[in-house]
């Protein structure tokens, strides 16, 4: 046992929730962002502007999402070069096979399959890396065979499970928009602020439609909410870094005083059902957009692209293109910016008044 521990340490193979559930998951979301999400935005712009070249570029970028996610995961796991490059093949296979179900239908588990399988393949590759004199053959061979083999065995099952969870969430939101609006908004909003990836969660379970809209609401409540709530401490720099960056910057302060999170959580519990019940706000762009909030305005761009040209996942879930009017635009602006700012500011005033939030509690270093 001691020899195994020594070997794993030498190979930098650390089986931990942080490395797999935070580092790898977050990197996967970045890979998805740099391929599928950017590709969708570029393709939509090309279609709207009549520029075939942009449509072609967007298609190429989207097609590489599996490879991009797997390579990003390998980078997070500190995989050596030969393993990292081999993961491109693993990601392609896992994403393709995870996008099917056990009965051969269309599945939503591509990103989730890539996450699980790329982690295992990367660690297998790291284990054999530089252990033989024919490393240039053995390392990619082990990485690719392990990854593609697991993809063939497990990816369709993962696709089936992810599809089932996503379908239940979407159907429940359609049937109970008030309750699920609160639940989805609060959970995804908290996931965005925690050091895990809300974007990857939304992508893994293909959250589109009303559930996607509730997720956007929750993320915006945290990002815009914390930006406004902490304005007196952090001024304009904090407003920008949190408002269109990430509310995760407040995680250290939340650990020191968890009560500073209450305004954002309460705000998300209000804006979520307003999004689902009043404005019927649907996010039918790439599912990853639902977990991005106002980060680079990706959530809002996702809603817009979903209006004009719904993503493949949204179409599979019954989404359809619409021509947005003043009501839709008003809903998007209110849910994304106005309500989170106003509500979180008001809740913050109350909590400061009763002494739950003190001067400096929200200051960013």
Predicted regions, residues:
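Pore-lining transmembrane helices
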Residues: 2-365
């Amino acid at each position: 046992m001691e020899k195994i521990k020594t070997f794993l340490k030498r190979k930098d193979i650390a089986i931990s929730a942080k490395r797999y559930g935070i580092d790898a998951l977050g990197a996967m979301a970045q890979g998805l962002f740099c391929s599928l999400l950017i590709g969708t935005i570029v393709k939509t712009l090309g279609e709207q502007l009549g520029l075939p070249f942009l449509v072609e570029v967007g298609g190429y970028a989207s097609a590489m999402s599996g490879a991009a996610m797997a390579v990003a995961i390998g980078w997070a796991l500190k995989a050596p070069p030969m393993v990292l490059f081999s993961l491109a093949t693993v990601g392609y296979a896992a994403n393709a096979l995870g996008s099917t179900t056990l009965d051969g239908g269309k599945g939503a588990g591509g990103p989730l399959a890539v996450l699980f399988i790329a982690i295992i393949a990367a660690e297998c590759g790291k284990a054999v890396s530089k252990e033989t004199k024919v490393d240039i053959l053995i390392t990619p061979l082990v990485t690719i065979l392990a990854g593609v083999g697991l993809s063939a065995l497990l990816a369709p099952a993962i696709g089936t499970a992810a599809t089932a969870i996503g379908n239940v969430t979407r159907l429940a939101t359609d049937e109970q928009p008030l309750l699920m609006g609160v639940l989805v908004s609060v959970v995804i909003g908290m996931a965005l602020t925690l050091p895990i990836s809300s974007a990857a969660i939304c992508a893994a379970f293909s959250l589109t439609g009303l559930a996607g809209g509730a997720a956007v609401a929750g993320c915006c409540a945290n990002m815009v909410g914390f930006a406004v709530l902490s304005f007196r401490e952090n001024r304009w720099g904090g407003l920008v870094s949190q408002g269109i960056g990430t509310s995760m910057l407040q995680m250290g302060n939340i650990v020191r005083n968890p009560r500073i999170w209450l305004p954002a959580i309460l705000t998300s519990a209000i804006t979520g059902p307003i999004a689902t019940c009043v404005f019927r706000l649907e996010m039918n762009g790439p599912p990853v957009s639902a977990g991005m909030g106002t980060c680079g305005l990706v959530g809002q761009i996702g809603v817009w692209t979903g209006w004009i040209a719904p993503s493949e996942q949204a179409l599979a879930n019954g989404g359809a293109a619409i021509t947005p009017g003043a009501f839709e635009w008003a809903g998007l602006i209110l849910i994304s910016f106005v309500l989170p700012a106003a509500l979180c500011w008001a809740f913050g005033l109350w909590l400061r008044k009763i002494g739950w939030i003190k001067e400096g509690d929200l200051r960013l270093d």
